[in-house]
Amino acid sequence: MFILVRPINCSLSRFHFALRSPCTIFARNMSTQENIYPIFDRMMTREDKEQLLHQRGVMLWFTGLSGSGKSTVAIALERELHKRGLLCRILDGDNIRSGINANLGFSAEDRRENIRRVAEVAKLFVDTGIITIAAFVSPTEELRQLAQQIIGKDDFKEIYISTPIEECERRDVKGLYARARRGEVKNFTGISAPFEAPQHPALSLDTSKLPIGESVKHLLKFLNVE
């Protein structure tokens, strides 16, 4: 079980003070120095940011076949965390490949670079104290190990959305499985490319058996924020 720091109620005035104080200190320091670079040695630590947010940063790495429910569960979890006053950020294929990874294709090299960039971005969020959810097929152990190495073993929690391919194909919201069956999509995971199931995930959820709400409850229990 992963334990998050529970949020603490703060008055609005205290919150504003917390935002103003570092700016005042930094402005005073800059006025007495000609070179700004030494300031980076005094950047706020991860612990400082987690204390401000009253939570711990963590990486929930959702892996599973296309259509398994990764993004759906991630969005539902984000809403529940938000209700509890916890800051969360979702990274998934749609918002990443339309922006920072728009120049990448689906070759083996590009898939690896896609995951590498996602992990580097995720690490920045985690180091800021944000609960970060990545929803990517990430079909091989090698790719998931790469992400873990970048983010850090203690922060990286592998969540396997283990919905069977039959159910994923039945859903086929984007029509990708049908296109892959017709040979229109090459190297499609589960059809023309393999998926290596995680051997020791922190949590495994089969959305063909568990409703989304129940899946989210398991995740909240895992995070100790029920």
Where are these regions (language model features)?
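Hydrophobic anchor at the beta1->P-loop junction of P-loop NTPases
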Residues: F62
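Conserved beta-strand scaffold positions in the cores of enzyme catalytic domains, especially
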Residues: I90, F156-Y160, A202-S204
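ATP-dependent NMP and nucleoside kinases share a basic, alpha-helical "lid"
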Residues: G99-F106, A122-A180, N187
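Small-molecule kinase domains that catalyze NTP-dependent phosphoryl transfer to phosphate-bearing small molecules
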Residues: S162-H218, V225-E226
